[in-house]
C-alpha cells in the first residue's frame, strides 16, 4: 500500500485488512514512526542485514539477539536496511512470506525496511522491468518521493533520514555499462 501526506517524525497506528477481514490484532503494537525532515539533526540507529533468508533456527536466534540488544540498550530502531538474499532459495512469494516477513514480523511491524534485491530474489524478479515477487513485496521510491533524485526504476533508489542520504543499488542483474 502507498501512504502519502504523513507528517515527519510522527507515530502512526495502523491495521491490516483483507476486505472485511482484519489480519492484525486491534492493539497499539502496530505502529510506525515516519522519518524526520531531510536535513534535520536526529539520532539514527539502524540494522544492516544480508543473506538472512534461510528461515532456519540460526536466523531466528540472530534476530532475537538483535532485538534483545536493542531492549537492553533502550535503543529505538529507526531503519532496517536489507542488502539482499531475504528469500532463499529462489525469491518466491512463499519464501518471502515464510523466511523473511514471518521471521522478522516483530521488527517489521514497527520499522521500515529499505531493501536491495540479492541474487536469490533475482531468480524470480527482474530489476530492468521491476517485475517479480521482490517488487510485489516492496514499493521502492523511484520518483524521489523519499529524497534524492528520481531514478525512474525501483531497482535503484535513494532516501533521506534526517541529515543522512542513503542510496540503494541492485547489483544483481542491471546493465552497468556507461
Please place each PLM-identified region on the residue numbering.
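Metal-dependent phosphoester/phosphodiester hydrolase catalytic core
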Residues: 1-178
